[in-house]
Amino acid sequence: WDYRQEDPVNDARGTRLERAAAHPDLLTDAPQLNITNVIAPNGGRIYVDHAHPEYSAPETTDPFEAVRYDRAGDLIMRAAAAKASETTGRKIVLHRNNVDGKGASWGTHENYMMLRSVPFDLVTRLMTTHFVSRQIFIGSGRVGIGEHSENAGYQLSQRADYFHMKVGLQTTFDRPIINTRDESHSTDEYLSLIHI
């Protein structure tokens, strides 16, 4: 992975956070040694994110293709677990979740390219309700309420308890619904990325 394109302190709202003032977890642009980080056969990416394997689907402009890539990720990870089981002689089991009920949450991101000329506050004002309310229809749910599952119950969203603000630059603490990190990874300067 080419970390030279990472710029975790560049905010899509037109500001930059000083590196010295940034929480260490925010500085994700330093290469991580001894971390699995490969390009999948379908053009996606498989890497370790905070001790969890993560699959990142390739880019697409077609929602049906996005679903196929998502399913392909399941198959790729299942094959990797089977190979690891065979190699180590120990059964490797992967679970598709993004919370552990003990305070940790990971994965499940979306990225959308948009024109940089579109005001970021307009996008957040128009899209936040959609990103929150769609859990009613497509949420995978979880048992337990609270970051540490301190209360019994069932929720439609696995990650609802882990969001603490509407918009923000950070990704690993005080998580926002919409992340403002300005890293489009595009050579076109007129494009921006919205990270969910």
Predicted regions and their residues:
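Long intrinsically disordered, low-complexity regulatory regions enriched in proline and serine/threonine
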Residues: 154-157, 164
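Histidine-centered divalent-metal-coordination microenvironment in nucleic-acid enzymes
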Residues: 98-99, 103-115
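Short, conserved charged micro-motifs
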Residues: 118-123
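Beta-sheet entry/capping signal
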Residues: 91-93, 109-111, 153
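Terminal catalytic/cofactor-binding subdomain
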Residues: 1-95, 104, 125-150, 161, ...
